[in-house]
């Protein structure tokens, strides 16, 4: 059996270069900044313009200690938030004392055909320097044939001084278009933080 070796490894061997490579550009749609806000809602800009949307949440700080940062969707431009979801959730953690680590599934933080808000991050610390960051990808929200998938990864400062790495995925179990997303804490306000909405072209 002969071995094929690829040695096309120099610029002189390239025959053509495309003028541009399309795909993957982030287009900022809107930005919202929390200031003791009970909720942050995006009720416009989520439509058929893009097949993928990304929410980036930056320096989210809760007013209340030990709470969960969460989200839900809407099919009526934000008049109500309670779309049925099925999700999965796992995370890894490591404490500052270097005495506790784990990687595991979080049974109590997933949803099974529920209209509740899905948490990104739990046991948020509300100390002056404690916060959380992450992103939520929402795919093809205006499609009226299939369910609407989403994935999220985030990190937050746990109220007991842990670094937490969170992974959430699932779908809105509806063929109706998702046209609004709301973020909130399980209790109390979002004291500070910024959420940006991007469309991916």
Explain the meaning of each model-derived region.
Residues 2-201:
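Surface-exposed molecular-recognition determinants
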């Amino acid at each position: 059996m002969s071995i094929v070796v690829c040695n096309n490894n120099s610029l002189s061997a390239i025959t053509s270069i495309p003028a541009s490579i399309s795909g993957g550009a982030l287009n900022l749609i809107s930005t919202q900044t929390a200031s003791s806000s009970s909720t942050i809602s995006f009720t416009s800009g989520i439509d058929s313009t893009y097949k993928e949307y990304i929410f980036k949440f930056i320096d989210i700080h809760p007013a209340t200690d030990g709470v969960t940062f969460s989200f839900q969707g809407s099919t009526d431009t934000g008049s109500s938030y309670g779309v049925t979801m099925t999700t999965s959730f796992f995370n890894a953690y490591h404490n500052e004392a270097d005495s506790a680590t784990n990687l595991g599934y979080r049974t109590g933080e997933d949803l099974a055909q529920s209209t509740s808000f899905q948490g990104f991050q739990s046991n948020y610390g509300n100390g002056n320097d404690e916060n959380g960051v992450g992103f939520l990808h929402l795919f093809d929200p205006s499609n009226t044939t299939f369910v609407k998938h989403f994935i999220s990864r985030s990190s937050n400062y746990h109220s007991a001084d842990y670094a937490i790495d969170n992974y959430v995925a699932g779908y809105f179990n509806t063929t109706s278009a998702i046209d609004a997303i709301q973020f909130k804490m399980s209790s109390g306000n979002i004291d500070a933080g910024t959420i940006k909405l991007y469309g991916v072209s």
